[in-house]
Amino acid sequence: FPEDEDVRRIDYHEPNCRYKQIQMYASRGCPRRCNFCAAATLYYDELNWRPRNVASVVEEIRTLHEKYPGMEGVFFDEEVHNIKKSFNISLAKAIRSAGLDHLKYEAMCEYASLDEEALEEMRAAGYYKIRFGIETGSDKVAEKMTLGKKHDLDKLRSMVKFGKSLGMLFYGTISIGGLGSNQEEDQKTVDLVYEMASKGWLDEIQVSINTPQPGTDFYNTCMEESLLSNSTNWEGFDGNGQVVVHYPHYPAEEIQTNFNKALSAFDFGKEEAQTRVFSKNAESSFNLIPDGARVLLLRCVRNWMIRLTLENLNKKASVDLLGQNVSTKDLKDLDGLDQIYSYGSGFFSVESIPLELIEKLRNKQYDFVLIPVANNHLQGYQNVLEVAETILPKEILYVYPEGHLQPAQPVTI
């Protein structure tokens, strides 16, 4: 098993998971050669997929759980967990036989290789979320990206619909601005995101700008076709909001616009799908906030959750919002907001917020600061909590995605 003596793996559990899940690998490699992916050209020297021995995987889970009682589950974070149906069924059955099906399991998969029988076995073993790369809603772009068998939108819809009937959650990744894309083709991706989110099929999303990393086929094509600037700024190659490819037919500004549209499409679709569940729970949970309370809402999650939180406060409270400049622009016209405070850019932290703004917020004497959160273990929200404590409200409450409120730890003064 991986080294776990001087480095405690539980201390590095994946913060982007809903539960406290330790990362594991049940397989190595990938049989696909997507043009933007480094796995085929840098990580491995050939296209293959090699699963581990099932008994070894189960023994690693058992060993970790015995060593770390606080461990809540496993995140199988390999390239692709489900190329071979028989492997997934065998692993799921072995997990159940070992009495480890009370843990929460999440896995990086390929939707085109999902199977109904395997999904049923995985769900019964404790798998609660599947992650996969959708990449694009365009057949034309998929061909240029060399997605091959990985791209099958009919299979995507049928497998996700079936998985939802089992109670499975799905996390999709998409990219904008890939080889072969243009305004029309990327709009198909935006439309697909909204369709899946509004039907309740897509629970979480990661949107990237398709970026040619050195060593990938995409990068080599860009070099051959002079699609990269001569004065390359490598800091822009993170896929997170910066466009480095220069298509003559598809300006960087349009790619950036479609990147933002894809995020907004998820927000609006997710809000549409989640409204009933959130509002049902909020009906009782939000009674923690009395009429006339002074509330500051921190914008530290996607906008769909901010909108639902405001909607379910139902004007019972006076609500202000604190967030980044770029995020607050999309929220300025929302009903139920009295005042929006922008602190600039960067993640929530006490250091990122000007002292004069902190003093102004303290003077408002808020009854509550609300911190919307996307996971149960609250990993990644410590800085946000420190900001809330610095503002000195009477009470701090977490808002969970299903509409529940929970008091945070006492304010440190």
Regions found by a protein language model. Give the residues of each.
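C-terminal accessory regions of radical SAM enzymes
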Residues: 4-11, 16-17, 21-23, 184-282
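Radical SAM [4Fe-4S] cluster-binding motif and immediate context
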Residues: 2-170
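Active-site and donor-binding regions of nucleotide-sugar-utilizing enzymes
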Residues: 296-310, 315-412
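Histidine-centered beta-alpha loop that forms part of the nucleotide-sugar donor binding/catalytic region
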Residues: 110-111, 135, 175, 210, ...
